[in-house]
Amino acid sequence: MLLRLYNTKTKSLSEVKNFSDIKVYACGPTVYNYAHIGNFRTYIFEDLLIKSLRLLKYNVNYAMNITDIGHLTGEFDEGEDKVVKAARERGLTVYEISRFFTEAFFCDCEKLNIVRPDKVLIASEYIASMIEVIKVLEQNGFTYFVNGNVYFDTSLFKSYGQMAGINLNDFEFSSVSRVEVDPSKKNKSDFVLWFTNSKFKDQEMKWDSPWGFGYPSWHLECAAMNLDCFRSTLDIHLGGVDHIGVHHINEIAIAECYLNRMWCDIFVHGEFLIMEDEKMSKSNNNFITIQDLETNGFSPLDFRYFCLTAHYRTQLKFTFNNLRACKVARKNMLNKLTAVFSSLNQFDLLLLSKNYENIESVLEKRYYDSFLEKIAFDLSIPQALALLWDIIKDDNLSALSKLRLTFKFDEVLSLGLKEGVFREIEKDRINIDDAMNSLLEERRLAKIRKDFKRADEIREYFYSKGFVLIDTEEGTKVKRG
């Protein structure tokens, strides 16, 4: 089954046709602070895409960058390096800051069940590749050097800004109008490829280059690391909608002028998580971290469930009330699945351990195919989540089928359902001592001779000790009350 995704370049759905080697790149974090839940909404959407591709039998090569240099506080080459600024404020070196927040990022990803990329590209480790890209662009006539910086001349790249619908004649710095336009530029839309000592003298991370001792721009980093990692073209590029109007159109300009051909087929962008009608932003001091959620009594997977309730191309409004509702929903789902699991016999438990494809069931397969159709249609995850609830509630499905489908779907949804069910089962497991076993046997015999008073007395005794007796066809089960 082919995956279709909304392609920002074409403003339409594009089919992902190459099953054998899909090259996917995602813009990763700038490691100067903790990633916030607005960032993680994007990373969760990207995680859902990677896992959907794999469930649909695509062979995926997935890379993500870590920006530890060159990402300025202004998007248009203005301001100072975010990592340097954070290091100065905390009294640490830039290397200490970037290492600490890189580890913190992947720790949070693990809590959210976000898969680690096949390749993690650290920007400061690819300086040679970045210099090589500038050299080729320079040879091809796309750069100019002024006031100590190497600029990309956007007027020479005829399709510059097309993905964002930008007309160079009308180009304005609307998102940062408070910033004075650099008078060194030939065109307003030109951007820096390499900064030297002429700017930001406190920059700690610098390297020698043919243009002077300096450091690369954020836009160059992503393009150069892509080209180094995948050696040529890219199938899918991922990021947030805030990347469309500056970062990604600059990446396209660099890569296509370097390759002298089209670089990336499909660009996919996730929408904002908003708070009080504004996007969540570290620069606006308007953000919540995963640690903040945990402090307030939420599991990171409650937040993941929350993100699954909205399509990745729609804005999602965050409130703690909404998150609380998702916490309750996920808990209810786990409780229902735990009850289903408790009803399995030993033969079902054995079958549950087998691969999904080995068991035939018409209704089960219908649900499975429906799930694939939903994720294959532009990641219709809210509909896939609703389908999971339908499965849990469907009395025509056996307990075995419900669990097999749920655990298979959770390979994409990643709500920790299998692990959660096993934890609940383990919590309910009771170590019965000899005295309790004797009482259970006494109660069994009392019921046979219809001494229900004694049977109820024993039930009440267990209840007073924090246990509940559940009578089934297979005998009496003991659970914690």
Curated annotation (Swiss-Prot):
Its cofactor is Zn(2+). Belongs to the class-I aminoacyl-tRNA synthetase family. The keyword Nucleotide-binding applies. Disulfide bonds: none annotated. A motif ('KMSKS' region) lies at residues 279-283. Keywords: Aminoacyl-tRNA synthetase, ATP-binding, Cytoplasm, Ligase, Metal-binding, Nucleotide-binding, Protein biosynthesis, Zinc. ATP binds at K282. GO terms for cellular component: cytosol. GO terms for molecular function: ATP binding; cysteine-tRNA ligase activity; zinc ion binding. Its EC number is 6.1.1.16. It comes from Borrelia turicatae (strain 91E135). One of its GO terms (biological process) is cysteinyl-tRNA aminoacylation. CDD domains: CysRS_core. It catalyses: tRNA(Cys) + L-cysteine + ATP = L-cysteinyl-tRNA(Cys) + AMP + diphosphate. It is found in: Cytoplasm. HAMAP family: Cys_tRNA_synth. This is Cysteine--tRNA ligase.
